[in-house]
Amino acid sequence: MSYQGKKNIPRITSDRLLIKGGRIVNDDQSFYADIYMEDGLIKQIGDNLIVPGGVKTIEANGKMVMPGGIDVHTHFQMPYKGMTTVDDFFQGTKAALAGGTTMIIDHVVPEPESSLTEAYEKWREWADGKSCCDYALHVDITHWNDSVKQEVQNLSKEKGVNSFMVYMAYKDLYQVSNTELYEIFTCLGELGAIAQVHAENGDIIAQEQARMLEMGITGPEGHVLSRPEELEAEAVFRAITVASQTNCPLYVTKVMSKSAADLISQARKKGNVVFGEPITASLGIDGTHYWSKNWAKAAAFVTSPPLSPDPTTPDYINSLLASGDLQLSGSAHCTFSTAQKAIGKDNFTAIPEGTNGVEERMSVIWDKAVATGKMDENQFVAVTSTNAAKIFNLYPRKGRIAVGSDSDLVIWDPDAVKIVSAKNHQSVAEYNIFEGMELRGAPLVVICQGKIMLEDGNLHVTQGAGRFIPCSPFSDYVYKRIKARRKMADLHAVPRGMYDGPVFDLTTTPKGGTPAGSTRGSPTRPNPPVRNLHQSGFSLSGTQVDEGVRSASKRIVAPPGGRSNITSLS
């Protein structure tokens, strides 16, 4: 599938670049070599390369050179209740590049009952005009019927979308039923697409929200109190179950709790094709801030599923990410201003949900996982770039340093230290949930489409230069096992002769019996006769009809060795 063209959008001219003296880090190996790039592609890798004149040389001085990051979960320029997130595609992708990310995958969120295709085209128009780096799109399924099914099929086959998200929460807005979940997973599995889920039990959340408000809890702490992690875990388990029944690969977005992460880990060990996506927030910070006395600060952390109030959760999730039980990372970058958040100042259920994280994602993971010895540099590349490229069928064009791959590269300094502050981040949001954190590891140089985007701490970006990258269905990384299981899972009826015995006539149901066609009771157990209360056996004389009949609960004492009345069956 080729790149999609755009009209009247400035194109960047790729530089001829030579990176010398760097240590190339892929997900499976690290080695020293030089890299020559031209026309936005990697042309040569090796020592003593022969390159044309006029090449710009970048001295890596032994620093790591790795594939540019891929942020698989963003919400740039997203409309919400008459508002729009403060970071549009220009500001959002600019922040991404500042943190070492050279491609993002944004979520298209159609209004309920509206066209998925029209929403997709709207997102394309916004992103084509403003994105500074390459991008792809997920499409969220916010309602379900035959018309939506046809749109999903068209988006998958014609529009370069291979992932669709459904919501198990947001009752009466986006939430799908279990039956719809089954139908959607079946459809996506047939298309070779990836089923993503926002996993929370929306029915229970609605009840808990009402209970919190009745108790007078209206602040941001009500958000986490009404969404305990058990509700995330229950939905994850349910989604895994439905995905297994439909033989559809499952992708759990925003893994926020230990319980949810454990369920994904256990399911993978049992052979389920399921992927888990923790986000910058769940990897870098906890939910104790919901109880801050400063309402604006507490509200800045409101996202769903909520951050866990257990302060050991980020370390735990980083460990599972390092071990491969969770496979990749996103940021779920969805920023609202404090004034926008304040529409819920008297009711936590009205606070717009979302946090920052696109710029901080790679440094947070390096600081929390690599610098602490949980994962090595190759695993870091896997969870920030390569696994995403494999899952969404972008590999090896993205996510790898190899001849023929896109020249999206990052020269990474593991010793660099930066202190996060809203005063100097690229996001428009006036608050940063990682404020004051000292993070080890940062990009020195960022190259996207063969063009230097970040150098010496200065950004050089071009609005609208980002390309839409279509994602083809049936990714081998995702579907190889699914295809094999389909061949093995063909169901066949048992060959047997025709039954020619007696058949009970349901039309002659006795008076007082269960009406024909009733589904009450077990279909395999005959229903006991219904007692006619007008023909009661109770007598005032003291002698009853059932006198002498042993009660089922009455114990009979048998002699040693037991008492037998069984006759021979021979």
Swiss-Prot record:
Entry's localization field: Cytoplasm; Cell projection, Growth cone
InterPro entries, per the entry: Amidohydro-rel, Hydantoinase/dihydroPyrase, Metal-dep_hydrolase_composite, Metal_Hydrolase, Metallo-dep_Hydrolases_sf
Gene: Dpysl3
GO CC terms in record: cell body; cytosol; exocytic vesicle; extracellular space; filamentous actin; growth cone; lamellipodium; synapse
Species in which this protein is naturally found: Rattus norvegicus (Rat)
Family classification: Belongs to the metallo-dependent hydrolases superfamily. Hydantoinase/dihydropyrimidinase family.
Tissues expressing this chain: Isoform 2 is expressed in growth cones. Up-regulated in motor neurons during axonal regeneration after sciatic nerve lesion. Overexpression of isoform 2 increased neurite extension and branching. Isoform 1 is expressed throughout neurons and their axons.
Spans annotated as Disordered: 506-570
PTM characteristics: Phosphorylation on Ser-522 by DYRK2 promotes subsequent phosphorylation on Thr-509, Thr-514 and Ser-518 by GSK3.
Annotated function: Necessary for signaling by class 3 semaphorins and subsequent remodeling of the cytoskeleton. Plays a role in axon guidance, neuronal growth cone collapse and cell migration.
NCBIfam families tied to this protein: D-hydantoinase
Modified residues (Phosphotyrosine): Y431, Y499
GO biological process: actin crosslink formation; actin filament bundle assembly; cellular response to cytokine stimulus; negative regulation of cell migration; negative regulation of neuron projection development; nervous system development; neuron development; positive regulation of filopodium assembly
Pfam families referenced in this protein's UniProt entry, alphabetically: Amidohydro_1
Biased composition range(s): Polar residues: 506-524, 533-544
GO molecular function, one term: SH3 domain binding
Keyword Phosphoprotein in annotation: yes
Positions where Phosphothreonine occurs in the chain: T509, T514, T543
Main location per the UniProt record: cytoplasm
Phosphoserine modified-residue sites: S259, S518, S522, S536, S539, S541
Assembly and interaction partners: Homotetramer, and heterotetramer with CRMP1, DPYSL2, DPYSL4 or DPYSL5. Interacts with synaptic vesicle protein 2 and SH3A domain of intersectin. Interacts with FLNA.
Name listed for the protein in its UniProt record: Dihydropyrimidinase-related protein 3
Keywords (A to Z) from UniProt: Cell projection, Cytoplasm, Phosphoprotein
